[in-house]
From Swiss-Prot:
<keyword id="KW-0963">Cytoplasm</keyword>
<keyword id="KW-0413">Isomerase</keyword>
<dbReference type="Pfam" id="PF00160">
    <property type="entry name" value="Pro_isomerase"/>
</dbReference>
<dbReference type="InterPro" id="IPR002130">
    <property type="entry name" value="Cyclophilin-type_PPIase_dom"/>
</dbReference>
<comment type="function">
    <text>PPIases accelerate the folding of proteins. It catalyzes the cis-trans isomerization of proline imidic peptide bonds in oligopeptides.</text>
</comment>
<dbReference type="GO" id="GO:0005737">
    <property type="term" value="C:cytoplasm"/>
</dbReference>
<dbReference type="InterPro" id="IPR024936">
    <property type="entry name" value="Cyclophilin-type_PPIase"/>
</dbReference>
<protein>
    <recommendedName>
        <fullName>Peptidyl-prolyl cis-trans isomerase</fullName>
        <ecNumber>5.2.1.8</ecNumber>
    </recommendedName>
</protein>
<feature type="domain" description="PPIase cyclophilin-type">
    <location>
        <begin position="1"/>
        <end position="148"/>
    </location>
</feature>
<comment type="similarity">
    <text>Belongs to the cyclophilin-type PPIase family.</text>
</comment>
<dbReference type="GO" id="GO:0006457">
    <property type="term" value="P:protein folding"/>
</dbReference>
<dbReference type="GO" id="GO:0003755">
    <property type="term" value="F:peptidyl-prolyl cis-trans isomerase activity"/>
</dbReference>
<dbReference type="InterPro" id="IPR029000">
    <property type="entry name" value="Cyclophilin-like_dom_sf"/>
</dbReference>
<dbReference type="GO" id="GO:0016018">
    <property type="term" value="F:cyclosporin A binding"/>
</dbReference>
<keyword id="KW-0697">Rotamase</keyword>
<dbReference type="InterPro" id="IPR020892">
    <property type="entry name" value="Cyclophilin-type_PPIase_CS"/>
</dbReference>
Length: 150
């Protein structure tokens, strides 16, 4: 993953720190993606994960507290591999994110794009294959480990 730290530094830092787990405990659980799942996968659209508190898309927590505001909408949902924040409306970013598997221009101005898959798109495509139109996965898809590469 390449994170757009120059364009959306707060959003990129949230994702990076949740990958490393370096911030320790959140409200009730560690602030870490490790062991969490991709709970919503829709082929031809996106793979969504990052809810490490509830595991079903209703939870999540940022390193800044429960939620944080939309930083900006400079980057767009231009195609496969775009990394963007999932939310429940304006200013509700937490830890949930999604990886686009196609261009999703209708999300521009609503979800903050903060990165791009630069290597491993084959893994994203493999995750996409276990999804369904309802978003439910045919089998669990877990983040076995995560961190930061130098």
């Amino acid at each position: 993953m390449e994170l757009f730290q120059d364009v959306v530094p707060q959003t990129a830092e949230n994702f990076r720190a949740l990958c490393t787990g370096e911030k320790g405990m959140g409200d009730r659980k560690p602030l870490h993606y490790k062991g969490s799942s991709f709970h919503r996968v829709i082929p031809g659209f996106m793979c969504q994960g990052g809810d490490f508190t509830a595991g079903n898309g209703t939870g999540g927590e940022s390193i800044y507290g429960a939620k944080f505001k939309d930083e900006n909408f400079i980057k767009k949902h231009t195609g496969p591999g775009v990394l963007s924040m999932a939310n429940a409306g304006p200013g509700t970013n937490g830890s949930q994110f999604f990886i686009c598997t196609e261009k999703t221009a209708w999300l521009d101005g609503k979800h903050v794009v903060f990165g791009q898959v630069v290597e491993g798109m084959d893994v994203v495509r493999a995750i996409e294959k276990v999804g369904s139109q309802s978003g439910q996965t045919k089998k669990p898809v877990k983040i076995a480990d995560c961190g930061q590469l130098s």
